[in-house]
């Protein structure tokens, strides 16, 4: 081949590479002002003048540049949840690890590759400010062919093409929980009263919702069957907001050496429901498009709630979790933890009408309903139609629901294996780390490592990306794990074993920088010398052939005091400082986080000058 021909091929290749991997620039202006997304006014965060934050849509491998202007009177950062930030750890958006907080009046430019493809989201990561409304959806459209994914739903060529088109242009549902109090006010209620408070006012969909007050008797009847008998003292009643009494030992744990002051909980926090009629989100769908298929990308931007998603009279195919494609399965409802993202495919094969989307809090924290509407295009009737699968509080309305619903908390109920197949290395990992989760010292103090509490301002002035050895020979080194590049790592999480925390609610565990396989789940105290030994002794508690692959996982609900453990495996190929934490904002604020310095032997050395600290 001549020199000219080789040069021409290089130019052509460069052209097509650049044509695909275009540069996309975004601007996000963060402000603080009054709003009333559920009909009741409070101050909150707006992004570019809107709430929730704008949906961002890119193509896989786009070069993304996002300039964030902090026009509030408080610090902020933005985390790109689900994006792996390969070779760009300085753009992860975690204060104290990848950057200093963006101070009032300042800006920060995040630069990264749009990867991996799929459904993700972005949100604030400064203290508890997720409660205040900085969150929005991200959709990264893939380069690859997904015929093998859609052909598991339908063999019809027209359907396959239609589903690809529907997934390329989905509907977005950003689901969040909402309180009448700002994040700072909410946290102060717990620390002042000495009680962990987690009572909410609304479930919002795309920033819209209402405050419902159906009455205490109705809410009591909506409790999950057996919950009070199994978990709480006989005769326990919820309030007129659907909340359990704040001073229950089963809720607060302990005993703790602190003074409890329930009288310092303001009115209307736990009880005293005040209804407000506002509006719910409406999703208009067109059965004449895409052969009647519609895709929905759902973001669980909740701060406390565990939600359940369903659409009256419509089944759906769950085909993506946490931006990772899974072998599709058909359900009528699906449980989502705070921080997760789901993508579902729905066939619009019902009579044109208005169908209620039911999205209640399904956790044991509160009986709370949430709603939106899916409306067939052209429907003129204001009356709602369809068969409900869930009640106001998330209970199944027929026996079929339990058989056709997604429950993510155990290996034997979670069969959402990756597509295409992707499994971890069998046998032992190269490194194992046991993390004991729970409360220490107070009902609102949470640890990921037996006793260490992750401070809200941990390393804010000296982020670990730039000072990876800053915690050595200090007590704060208990907040840091270090791994080697190219190693397989097992994270073993133990719950319900710390003194005062034998009754444990779920934790929604999210790792930055990489996804993990959940390869094991079991009861009891972890007392094995290695994961390999546990696999030999308890093979039914492990799955290394088709384990799920995600960035957010739920631990077991153990209000009865039984201990549980989970094992998560991942491969280290993305050196940098990555936060591993509970996505319940109250738990993270209380200390439930740990910094994992992945690949310390291949630490990023060539940090761009624009990110160097002054």
Curated annotation (Swiss-Prot):
GO molecular function: copper ion binding; oxidoreductase activity
Occurrences of domain Plastocyanin-like (ranges): 30-143, 172-360, 469-599
GO cellular component: cell surface
UniProt cross-references to Pfam families, sorted A to Z: Cu-oxidase, Cu-oxidase_2, Cu-oxidase_3
Top-tier EC class: oxidoreductase
Keyword Signal carried by entry: yes
Subcellular location: Cell surface
Residues spanning the signal sequence: 1-21
Principal cellular location given in the protein's record: other
Keywords: Copper, Glycoprotein, Metal-binding, Oxidoreductase, Repeat, Signal
Glycosylated residue positions: 75, 257, 280, 445, 469, 485, 527
Residues reported to bind Cu cation 2: 81, 123, 583
Alphabetized InterPro entries for the sequence: Cu-oxidase-like_N (IPR011707), Cu-oxidase_2nd (IPR001117), Cu-oxidase_C (IPR011706), Cu-oxidase_fam (IPR045087), Cu_oxidase_CS (IPR033138), Cu_oxidase_Cu_BS (IPR002355), Cupredoxin (IPR008972)
The protein's annotated pathway: Pigment biosynthesis
Positions that bind Cu cation 4: 507, 510, 582, 587
Family recorded in the similarity comment: Belongs to the multicopper oxidase family.
UniProt-recorded name of the protein: Laccase 1
């Amino acid at each position: 081949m001549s020199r000219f021909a080789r040069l021409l091929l290089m130019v052509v290749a460069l052209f097509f590479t650049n044509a695909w991997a275009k540069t996309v620039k975004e601007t996000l202006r963060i402000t603080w002002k009054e709003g009333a997304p559920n009909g009741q006014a409070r101050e909150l965060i707006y992004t570019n003048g809107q709430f929730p934050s704008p949906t961002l849509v890119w193509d896989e491998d786009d070069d993304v540049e996002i300039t964030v202007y902090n026009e509030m009177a408080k610090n902020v950062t933005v985390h790109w949840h689900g994006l792996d930030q390969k070779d760009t750890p300085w753009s992860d958006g975690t204060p104290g690890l990848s950057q200093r907080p963006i101070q009032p009046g300042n800006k920060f430019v995040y630069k990264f590759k749009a990867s991996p493809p799929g459904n993700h989201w972005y949100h604030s990561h400064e203290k508890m400010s997720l409660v205040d409304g900085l969150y929005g959806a991200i959709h990264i459209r893939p380069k690859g062919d997904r015929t093998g994914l859609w052909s598991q739903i339908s063999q019809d060529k027209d359907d396959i093409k239609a589903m690809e088109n529907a997934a390329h242009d989905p509907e977005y549902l950003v689901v969040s929980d909402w309180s009448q109090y700002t994040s700072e006010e909410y946290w102060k209620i717990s620390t002042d009263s000495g009680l962990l408070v987690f009572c909410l006012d609304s479930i919002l969909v795309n920033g819209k919702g209402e405050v419902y007050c159906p009455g205490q008797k109705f809410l009591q009847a909506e409790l999950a069957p057996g919950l009070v008998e199994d978990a709480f003292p006989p005769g326990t009643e919820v309030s007129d907001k659907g909340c359990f009494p704040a001073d229950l030992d089963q809720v607060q744990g302990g005993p703790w050496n602190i003074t409890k002051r329930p009288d310092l909980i303001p009115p209307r926090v736990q009880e005293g429901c005040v209804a407000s009629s506002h509006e719910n989100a409406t999703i208009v769908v067109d059965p004449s498009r895409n052969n009647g298929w519609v895709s929905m990308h759902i973001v669980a931007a909740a701060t406390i709630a565990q939600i359940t998603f369903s659409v009256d009279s419509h089944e759906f195919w769950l085909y993506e979790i946490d931006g990772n494609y899974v072998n599709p399965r058909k359900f009528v409802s699906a449980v989502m933890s705070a921080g997760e993202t789901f993508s579902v495919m729905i066939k619009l094969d019902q009579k044109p009408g208005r169908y209620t989307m039911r999205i209640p809090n399904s956790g044991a924290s509160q009986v709370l309903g949430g709603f939106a509407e899916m409306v067939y295009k052209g429907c003129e009737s204001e009356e709602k139609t369809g068969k409900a699968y869930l009640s106001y509080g998330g209970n199944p309305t027929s026996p079929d629901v339990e058989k056709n619903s997604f429950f993510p908390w155990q290996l034997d109920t979670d069969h959402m294996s990756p597509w295409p197949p992707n499994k971890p290395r069998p046998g032992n990992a190269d490194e194992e780390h046991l993390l004991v989760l729970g409360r220490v010292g107070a009902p609102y103090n949470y640890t990921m490592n037996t006793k260490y509490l992750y401070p809200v301002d941990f390393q804010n002035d000296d982020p670990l990306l730039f000072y990876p050895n800053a915690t050595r020979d200090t007590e704060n080194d208990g907040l840091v794990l270090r791994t080697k590049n190219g190693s397989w790592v097992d994270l073993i999480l133990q719950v319900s074993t710390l003194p005062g925390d034998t009754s444990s609610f779920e934790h929604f565990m999210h790792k930055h920088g990489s996804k993990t396989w959940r390869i094991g789940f079991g009861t009891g105290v972890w007392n094995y010398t290695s994961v390999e030994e546990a696999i030999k002794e308890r093979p039914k508690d492990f799955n290394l052939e088709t384990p799920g692959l995600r960035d957010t996982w739920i631990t077991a609900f153990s209000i009865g005091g039984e201990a549980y453990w989970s094992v998560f495996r991942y491969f280290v190929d993305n050196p940098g400082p990555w936060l591993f934490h509970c996505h319940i904002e109250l738990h993270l604020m209380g200390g439930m986080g740990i910094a994992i310095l992945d690949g310390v032997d291949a630490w990023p050395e060539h940090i761009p000058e624009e990110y160097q600290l002054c």
